[in-house]
């Protein structure tokens, strides 16, 4: 009877995963229709819905198992046998690696994230040699120009499944040919071989054609973002052929793509050639398998810990008033723990901080907010923690610590991509770098605001600079929707003495924001003030912010470009 129960539990979990991934594919398959209908609000809702599917189905399976087992507690041997039986169901299973993550999630939900050991759940994959094997159905089609690049592109684009007419396809093809010829020599292009993914990658208001360009043994990305105009006609906005550009398109600060992937491991392996700087975790996350991306992130962390003797240290930069942040000197991620007590000037609660981080997970991050992975009962060997960090942990987060003697358990933390704090970057920057950083910072604020996100605390220390020089927001404890804020002009003083008073001469409500004050705390440095006024002086005007609010209330969804505006074909035509 017990053996049958173990079998039933294993099969119930796998069937639950089948149901979840089926719904995942169903929501994803609707991306083309939403794009063709220009139903951008439905795009946003589908993104949130797909993110919630995973936890919803984990919850359904957990309730089933509680009913099946009558909520009995099982010993270690029983749980190990369930995992063994589950593993035996996976050898011919097409998505076994994500099924392993689903098993982990069910286990963690049942046992409150306790006893996370390899004998009970899939800390490591059961079949690492099978993860990126050959697949029966090709993911891409091959095209060779044979001296007629324009003709080949015509064939590629006419072969797409999109059912809308083109605005001016021959014009767009001319632009693509021009971009390719500017990027590569005739000698390189003589051996050109294109591989075009069968499925389009949908995100925001664009459908991306994703391909590879093979030239004399070298491989380059070939990315075409397809948009529509107001008449419902298609146009291609640019052509990207560098790995740095592709890395930004698939960046950790962007929403997940909607791409139909019955075999995600195969897609991850296919993408790896054009995104060599992306980890396995980042690639799974980019195509919407963010929960498995979390599993892979943890495995990458374990691999680093195993190969390194570094100690965890307090992260460089200004210490936060809400979060304690630490890292490993050579690791590309940071760890963030919500403090037990906040600084007096922070009027937020622990629950509100958790809500803010969840909001960021579900919202369109427009390339300006870092994605995070959330972990519970995170175990660290005590000897790997520097004395300074250990003291900081014991002082700032004692309620979230459990001391096991040789190990420390942190009950809740976030893992996030490591960046250079913007304030530290600006201190070391030359004039051109400083100007570029201010331009990026202002663009980040404006793009977040257009996506209905107000950062709250806009100090430079709350932003980071990526390896591609992009500025990304990463301090979420004060974020809110733009539509919740009351942007006000500062009233003129009643008397000359008003300006000298320590208290304002006007009333201030909790949601009031005075953009004129931004100049005071952002522009104390003369050079910074000059660059800011030159490029983003409108951020100091309440009317600018109110105008954005009105566009949001009117239902307008802004375009989000994963490349600079000057790279758009429409901008080239103007120049």
Curated annotation (Swiss-Prot):
GO terms for biological process: glucose metabolic process; glyoxylate cycle; tricarboxylic acid cycle. It is found in: Cytoplasm. It holds the Pfam family AceK_regulatory. GO terms for cellular component: cytoplasm. Its EC number is 2.7.11.5, 3.1.3.-. GO terms for molecular function: [isocitrate dehydrogenase (NADP+)] kinase activity; AMP binding; ATP binding; phosphoprotein phosphatase activity; protein serine/threonine kinase activity. Keywords: ATP-binding, Cytoplasm, Glyoxylate bypass, Hydrolase, Kinase, Nucleotide-binding, Protein phosphatase, Serine/threonine-protein kinase, Transferase, Tricarboxylic acid cycle. It catalyses: L-seryl-[isocitrate dehydrogenase] + ATP = O-phospho-L-seryl-[isocitrate dehydrogenase] + ADP + H(+). InterPro entries: AceK_kinase, AceK_regulatory, Isocitrate_DH_AceK. The keyword Transferase applies. The active site is at 371. ATP binds at residues 315-321, 336. Belongs to the AceK family. Bifunctional enzyme which can phosphorylate or dephosphorylate isocitrate dehydrogenase (IDH) on a specific serine residue. This is a regulatory mechanism which enables bacteria to bypass the Krebs cycle via the glyoxylate shunt in response to the source of carbon. When bacteria are grown on glucose, IDH is fully active and unphosphorylated, but when grown on acetate or ethanol, the activity of IDH declines drastically concomitant with its phosphorylation. This is Isocitrate dehydrogenase kinase/phosphatase.
